[in-house]
């Protein structure tokens, strides 16, 4: 009994720091019980975004049909199909639709009606949240007005007050900004929590824009994917991660991402590649041009040379890493010493294959894993750019802050790929740097 009393005392002392009086504790109990009676907030799960910012923006904007569902619920019997579709487009792509409408003669009337309709939608999507939570999601510049409009009912004595606010917004030419704020709040409240289940980066052109969109949400968690982890490593200066991140970006022709968005200086890589592979067409290494670069258009032949140069550096660094860590059990991935450089073949598990590319001027057959002086200078220069990119560091710090190898939320285990576990479901031990580690 004494041990139980001591334990209770510890809990009470801990609680007293936040709730020093009985009244404080009572109010918090009432609040928590009331909140528990509200409907559960909408959770949105997205994975494998791979830099496709436009598709990601659309999915976020529509909330996978949640917004369309609310519009139909409110206006199916009172608005024609065209107007209902226009409302959805407005919420998803607010600025573009406003720009289209602003040149029309009845723009002010359209704004007045639209604000009224958006408020009705907003009342529905916010109905499952407390006022405190809604305020946190509101754009700060219109928070007071939005709060007033959302809390005003249909009572006759409040009707004039309600419409006078809307009239005042239009009279001072704040209607466009207010509609943008309303649409933003609707999008925010249509999804209570955003779960990103890995692979924000690589392949697509703008993971940077995806990150900026994610960072506008109040409630976010991120389970790191393999394509995110090497960017995390690159931002910390890991040479092998730098090589892999740069290689994949070049492979998919994402020069805008590297140079324009993140300020990664590729001049040393282009100069090195052009010199070392001057007479080599590097056909095997031609990048996949799925998307065009707007700001940093690189010649396809030069891009292929750059791709080959950084790939060879990565292969060497990978072999060095595996050699340093035999406990990884990845010796089968050491391939540079399996190549017959004279005949242009490779021996894998007793079978000889002809190589598609046989020109390796930077590889010493006697020591194939060693970087040349030029390669070492180049990868160090790239690492410096990754470490000193303010935008990249801001994005990676956010991923560190909001993420992990796995996340547990609402009883759900979220992870992107594979996590080593034992048969009973507990985390397996992995030997790293002289010790066995498990978990997170």
What annotation goes with each model-predicted range?
Residues 1-440:
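Feature recognizes metal-dependent phosphohydrolase scaffolds
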